[in-house]
Amino acid sequence: MEEKNTLVIGDFHFGTKTNSIQWLEEMENYFVEIESLIVANCAQKVIFLGDLFDVRYSINTLVGIKVKDMVREMIERNPVKSFNFLAGNHDYYSPKKEDMHYNAYEMVFGSEFMKEHDNVHFYTERPYLDEDGDLYLPWFFTEDKELFGQTIEHFKGELIKRIFCHSDLCTWDIDMIKNMNGNPVYSGHIHTPWTDEEHKLYNLGAALPLNFNDVNDKRYVYLLRGTEIVRKFENEETYQFYRYFNEEIFDLTKFDNCFVQLYIDKDLINKAKYIEKVKELKLNNPGISIRVVAMDKTMINDDEVGIDMNQDIKKYIDSNIPKNLYSKYETIKEKIEEREK
């Protein structure tokens, strides 16, 4: 049996930046671009990996209607293709399991939408294994380790080929990985792409950069054929985020559709050549947000106490991780150290 082409899309966060109209228009344009990728690559199945919406406790009326209309138009223009939407943490009103019914898909689309369109599926309150062997796990079913174990046990003996979820795969411990029985896992949730090839774990990242945590980094839509990622399509449509340091700014001229931070040492920032270069960049890029940040030689923590940069930074980091996050930090650190060996 020939493997289906599957287009996989990470977090979108419609309604971000306090429901900014400007951002909404950018995201609408990219949504249209994604439909062209679906058609051009003969994708029979389309999977959104969660966090289609941003503000979990309220959906802006304009945002909700725009997204509903875009999804409706997309699935109606492609009636023989299967469209699948996983619920992410931002799509739920509350992090309590008993409240999982209160989610963005139920409010914006409702069960009537699925009855009207038989080629769209929203996975919000229970896992689902489809006829292709794709297992869909909404956010709640990976965040609770006990619930995760029960879910995998429930599908034991079934033919699972791929798993799609909304989780930080970097924090999965060896027990969770063993439960996968070697099946690849593709996930949203973490905005920066991350891969563990050995265990077949793929955090595919967000569909678009959303803030300066995504600085100097590209985002993609992925084409899968079977379990293999056969192509990545770079997002060149929406805003990008860039950060440059000191002498790097002298290689810059024009920016396009982005936000820029220029980090300059305090002892350099008032030198004539830096002042003139910053003026030139702002003059030549009137529509671009360019922020200049003066850097100190020391790092500053929340209490505005200077850190001795000659001390062991690893020990400093270890001692400043919050207790409730330390186990996750240890898991991530061990994986990084293992990969660096």
Question: Where do the model's predicted regions map?
Answer:
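Conserved catalytic scaffold of divalent metal-dependent phosphoesterases
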Residues: 84-178
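Accessory, non-catalytic peripheral segments of nucleic-acid enzymes
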Residues: 225-341
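N-terminal active-site segment of His-dependent metallophosphoesterases
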Residues: 1-65, 148-160, 335, 341
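Short, conserved loop/helix-junction motifs that constitute active-site signature segments
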Residues: 74-79, 155-157, 176-181, 253-255
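Metal-dependent catalytic neighborhoods of phosphoester/phosphodiester hydrolases
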Residues: 18-20, 50-71, 87, 92-114, ...
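Active-site neighborhood of phospho(di)ester-bond hydrolases with catalytic His/Asp-centered motifs
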Residues: 8-10, 45-51, 82-89, 121-126, ...
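Active-site regions of enzymes building and remodeling cell-envelope glycoconjugates
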Residues: 119-121, 132-134, 160-161, 177-185, ...
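Conserved beta-sheet core of the metallophosphoesterase superfamily
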Residues: 168-232
